[in-house]
Amino acid sequence: MKQNEISQKNSEFWSELCGSQLAKAIGVTDSSPASLRKFDDWYFEFYPYLFDHIPFSDLKGMNVLEVGLGYGTVSQLIAASGANYTGLDIAEGPVAMVNHRLEQQALSGVAVQGSILSPPFEAETFDKIIAIGCLHHTGDLAEAISRCYRLLRPGGSLIFMVYYSYSYRRWLQAPKKTLRYLMDEIQGKRSVIGVAESKDRAAYDTNSSGESAPHTDWISKKSLSVLCQEFSTFQPTLENIDSTPPFQRWTRSQLLKTRIPSLMGLDLYATATKS
């Protein structure tokens, strides 16, 4: 697909809030304060390591841009921390949810609809950019990271998560593609795995109709470091694991305490700082 087609499909697909199916599963049926609190409590319990990557307590007074808003859980906590919050999402649904949360909680900030590939902001506007599980869906991960770099002030940092190319899930579900990617990297090539069948994408993201996300990239630490070479520092960390084959004998909580996520976890978190 061409980039404009990917962006259009992303705008349509992600307008259904990421987390909608989960919300229904835990009994969240509206956007009242109590319902959103229930969702948020579940979310942070499921992803406890988010607090290791996002310095919520240090964001007060900072200009913070969040890219990819989902159900607005992270958005609300950023705004509540005292940051000067701005949210950006390519889809209408998440933008509406975050603005609803901000108004409902009497928090300052605003969410706007747009693409990080052509962001509606001036260069060197933000102290922090936070993008959890978003940039790998844009269709151009390299350009998305480059745009973030330009939007950051000197000394600012990009905190983001993308899907890891060598996770246990990729080795199990797409072994040939993963091995081919590994061989390419051994030969010095640095890139993403960006061409994937619908079933591969569906293993990570689907909507309520069972449709997979329009585009998904997977990337290694080495290749991601190259995409972040404009930054002065780059610190990657692997996280996340599911209690699914071959780990179905253990609970997810048990698995998170093992070394498996740090060796071949599903998600690649990184903090890149601009000098």
Question: How would you name each of these model-derived features?
Answer:
Residues 34-62:
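Conserved alpha-helix/loop element of class I SAM-dependent methyltransferases that forms part
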Residues 142-154:
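A short glycine-rich, Lys/Arg-flanked "PGG" loop and its adjoining helix->strand segment in the class I
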Residues 1-36:
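N-terminal, positively charged/glycine-rich alpha-helical extensions of SAM-dependent methyltransferases
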Residues 128-139:
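A short SAM/SAH-binding and catalytic strip from SAM-dependent methyltransferases
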Residues 180, 186-275:
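A C-terminal cap/extension of S-adenosyl-L-methionine-dependent methyltransferases
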